[in-house]
Amino acid sequence: SAEDAGRKAHRAAGSYTQALKQLTVGHDEQEFLDMFVLLMRKCYLRDIKEMYAWAERMATWGRERQKAFLDYALRLIRENFVYNFRLPQLNYLSQSEEEFSRNFARFVNEANVMGIAAELTSARRDIAQNVNARMVFFDFALKMIVLLIPPKA
């Protein structure tokens, strides 16, 4: 559609290479979004058993794909933080990402955005250094519970 093409052009930010990439990454990006949404819902519900199952599934992916997912998740956290400013020209979200972000963005704020970004960066570094992926993803999932919904005092 014309709206979808406009979104992809906006996300490419004037880069021809990025525009071409936007046309070819659709399937992986949708699966990354699905896995991100699944994790965030399980974290919100504090469903430890399902979070472990999520980490198990992530561990079956290849290292490069795992790193690509973590890069994607970091971008999505940034976009959700910016989404709270209500300035659409600053956002680079696909339509499906924006639908998710309408409800999720309120959980990403100035109190936790740096912590979430640090955990994603740390997880990516650990994956790159060949640390056990199941441990890395489960540890990340557990930390997200506290970062997204801080314990009540």
Regions found by a protein language model. Give the residues of each.
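Charged, glycine-rich active-site and insertion segments that engage polyanionic ligands
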Residues: 1-72, 76, 80-153
